[in-house]
Amino acid sequence: MRSKLSILSLITLIVFVIAGCSNDVTEKEGKEGKIVLSPKSDDIKGKVLFDSAHGQTAGSADWVINGGFSDFADALTKENYEVTDLGYNQLLNYDKMKDYEVVVIPEANNPLKASEQDAIEQYVKSGGSILMISDHYNADRNFNRYDSSEVMNGYRRGAFDNPTKGMNAEESSSDKMKDVQSRDFLNEVFGLRFRYNALGNIKVDDLADEKDSFGITKGVKAVSMHAGSTIAITDPDKAKGVAFVPKLSKDDAWNHAVDQGIYNGGGRNEGPYIAVSKVSKGKGAFIGDSSMVEDKSPKYKREDNGETKKTYDGFKEEDNQKMIMQIVDWLNKKDDDQDLSTMNVHLDDKTNLLNFEQPENSRENEKEPWGTPKQGYKWYDSSTYA
């Protein structure tokens, strides 16, 4: 299958050249290796690294720069950003990230190792910027019990004391689970957490004004959510919201929510849909739904059964593209402030959390994983992928 993918990548490159594509693809080795998309201009605005090593193509996901995130990648290169894919079998470390202004982690399905969390923290505190794009709770795409919000937060819901809870011996001892430790990571480093709520189809038009959003919301009227989550602000000196869902009722919850789905009745009490953070020399931005970024050009077949994926044109909806690009522009700029308290912006209140949102009190509401994978498929062993 990998050789077929390489041939398809070559064909795609030839088509781009014949069509006069606005990007020069300087290297394109497919899923297993590094992909670099360079703008034609020599005046590179910044360098952006995309993580693809944490299950970004699991299940129906295809969140890679030559697939379901290609519209995003193309928009970046048109704005003179150089865009690079980390590589399918790579781990995040400081040396890999340090030469990039922005690192994007799209809806990760495999957990970050403790060493990767440490590297992200070092990278940001040294002046780098991170963009994390999550999804609703129970979006486990490869049946490994981890949702993207759990991966990014740093712990599994209901398994804070044991990240391998419920796994068999082969899973728990696999390379994917080595050095995986529970940590309240986003809260400790960035002053926020992805909530484990699950909201349905929402038009998000309650936006922080341009001044209080560092220009991120300039010209933006609304962005969209199609089954997503919000973010809890735990330290207002570090983190603040820039886009908020409207007031909601129980009918606005995602149909497959494992609990009430909506925690604080929506509105600003629910926590922001999109948040930013200022940490030492660096920055972070966080989005509660991958639907806002995806496009309808998936590259790969499903890893569990080989079927064709279907993705959607979320990047083109509402003002999603404008908002996302302005997020990257803000992340690309350096600021000397150590946190938000000195940046002359309105600071948010802390989000009121439910008791079960404390990591040690969290619970697994339904049996996990939510489904049974095709016989022979093992999320932790790529040799079993279709």
Regions found by a protein language model. Give the residues of each.
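Short secondary-structure boundary micro-motifs
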Residues: 3, 32, 104-105, 259-261
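Aromatic (Trp/Tyr) and acidic
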Residues: 10
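Short loop/turn segments at secondary-structure transitions that flank enzyme active sites
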Residues: 14, 192, 290-293
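C-terminal motif of bacterial Sec signal peptides marking the signal peptidase cleavage site
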Residues: 17-20
